Amino acid sequence: MEKMLLKSTTRHVRIFTAEVVNNDLKYHPNKLTLDLDPDNEFIWNEESLKKVNQKFTELVEERAGKSLDDYELRKIGSEVEGLIKYLLQNSLLSYNPECRVMNYSMGLPKTKEVL
């Protein structure tokens, strides 16, 4: 029986048991692919992207030898989502004012007027 591609989706993180081949996702039992901020809700800088990718790599390496099932994918996605919130709260990431829908999904921005 052929295995199905698994995915875990949070608001800002999508993880697939796949690799990208010619811009298509192809199932791979031992590889994960990260799709970060698919709605472009944030403005990313190189440092923030690097931190998220490093965290993702750490989380995947911690699970080496474990089954890449729905539960493990959700745990990884939740931890990456938590890092995104941390980056936003510490002004290392900002909301994108050009985003299709501005809903402040991780809380209102901190500005001098609000503080």
From Swiss-Prot:
Pfam families: NdhM (PF10664). InterPro entries: NdhM. It catalyses: a plastoquinone + NADH + (n+1) H(+)(in) = a plastoquinol + NAD(+) + n H(+)(out); a plastoquinone + NADPH + (n+1) H(+)(in) = a plastoquinol + NADP(+) + n H(+)(out). It comes from the Bacteria. It is a peripheral membrane protein. It is found in: Cellular thylakoid membrane. NDH-1 shuttles electrons from an unknown electron donor, via FMN and iron-sulfur (Fe-S) centers, to quinones in the respiratory and/or the photosynthetic chain. The immediate electron acceptor for the enzyme in this species is believed to be plastoquinone. Couples the redox reaction to proton translocation, and thus conserves the redox energy in a proton gradient. Cyanobacterial NDH-1 also plays a role in inorganic carbon-concentration. This is NAD(P)H-quinone oxidoreductase subunit M. It comes from Prochlorococcus marinus (strain MIT 9515). The lineage of its organism: Bacteria, Bacillati, Cyanobacteriota, Cyanophyceae, Synechococcales.
